[in-house]
């Protein structure tokens, strides 16, 4: 049974994307198609803020791209030595909040201690942050231009100061249309399609509708999280399942429950 995941590939130690591995255990043949590209912005401003941890109460990361922006700042501005010598430890003396295991892993790789990774989405992370003692200093929140309002609003309502800054913007992947066309020609109609973000849905849906034709209604549509579910509902797309958390295991469990493949894990 063939399933389509609209995301880019991330290799683990085995050289395979963990989502493909997990779905294979369930007897599902998964294909990944990237639908998003990212352009970084405001890096000099971010670099300046990273140099002054004393001005902030901590950090918030809700996407891997925001962590990549920090890594780029360290590399481009020759700050790696200063980061290793003192900046990293000064940030670690504060709270570094993250959503999801993928983001937490990248945060750990730049030497920071992540907390809140098990939250799974921005709303749950906001609840976690609100449950902790807060500083009078703002939390620094590097994010994309298309960020949800849930986390900032919840923190504001609780009187927790936060300074968000746009460090990347999301654009359509240049190969979306061609990759989807090739997939449909080679593999046919997938049993399910998983959307990993509202932006991914926005940039790919019209191509999927055109390529699927009269078979569109046969496809089971899956969301990686609540914000994607809301975006799908706004488009009138039936949501067969929302993963309980943005992890390979949770997504595989959701797809397995919807499709009930043979030889399932």
From Swiss-Prot:
Disulfide bonds: none annotated. Its main location: cytoplasm. One of its GO terms (molecular function) is uroporphyrinogen-III synthase activity. GO terms for biological process: cellular response to amine stimulus; cellular response to arsenic-containing substance; heme A biosynthetic process; heme B biosynthetic process; heme O biosynthetic process; porphyrin-containing compound biosynthetic process; protoporphyrinogen IX biosynthetic process; response to platinum ion. The keyword Lyase applies. SUPFAM superfamilies: HemD-like. Its EC number is 4.2.1.75. Pathway: Porphyrin-containing compound metabolism; protoporphyrin-IX biosynthesis; coproporphyrinogen-III from 5-aminolevulinate: step 3/4. It catalyses: hydroxymethylbilane = uroporphyrinogen III + H2O. CDD domains: HemD. Keywords: Cytoplasm, Heme biosynthesis, Lyase, Porphyrin biosynthesis. It is found in: Cytoplasm, Cytosol. The keyword ATP-binding does not apply. It comes from the Eukaryota. GO terms for cellular component: cytosol; mitochondrion. Catalyzes cyclization of the linear tetrapyrrole, hydroxymethylbilane, to the macrocyclic uroporphyrinogen III, the branch point for the various sub-pathways leading to the wide diversity of porphyrins. Porphyrins act as cofactors for a multitude of enzymes that perform a variety of processes within the cell such as methionine synthesis (vitamin B12) or oxygen transport (heme). Belongs to the uroporphyrinogen-III synthase family. Monomer. This is Uroporphyrinogen-III synthase. It comes from Mus musculus (Mouse). The gene is Uros.
């Amino acid at each position: 049974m063939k399933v389509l995941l609209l995301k880019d590939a991330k290799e683990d130690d085995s050289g395979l994307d963990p989502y493909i591995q997990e779905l294979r255990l369930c007897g599902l043949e998964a294909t990944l198609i990237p639908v998003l590209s990212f352009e970084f912005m405001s890096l000099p401003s971010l670099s300046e803020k990273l140099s002054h941890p004393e001005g902030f109460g901590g950090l918030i990361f809700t996407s891997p791209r925001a962590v990549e922006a920090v890594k780029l700042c360290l590399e481009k501005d020759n700050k790696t030595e200063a980061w290793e010598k003192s900046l990293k430890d000064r940030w670690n003396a504060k709270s570094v909040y993250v959503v999801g295991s993928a983001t937490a892993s990248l945060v750990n790789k730049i030497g920071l201690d992540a907390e809140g990774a098990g939250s799974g989405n921005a709303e749950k992370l906001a609840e976690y942050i609100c449950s902790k003692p807060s500083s009078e200093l703002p939390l620094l929140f590097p994010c994309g231009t298309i960020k949800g309002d849930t986390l900032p609003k919840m923190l504001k309502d609780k009187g927790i100061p936060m300074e968000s800054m746009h460090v990347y913007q999301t654009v359509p992947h240049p190969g979306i249309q061609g990759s989807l066309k090739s997939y449909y020609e080679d593999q046919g109609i997938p049993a399910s399609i998983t959307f990993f973000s509202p932006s991914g849905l926005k940039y790919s849906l019209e191509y999927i509708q055109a390529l699927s034709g009269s078979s569109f209604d046969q496809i089971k549509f899956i969301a990686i999280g609540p914000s994607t579910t809301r975006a799908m509902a706004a488009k009138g797309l039936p949501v067969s399942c929302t993963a309980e958390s943005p992890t390979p295991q949770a997504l595989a469990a959701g797809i397995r429950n919807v499709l009930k493949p043979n030889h399932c894990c």
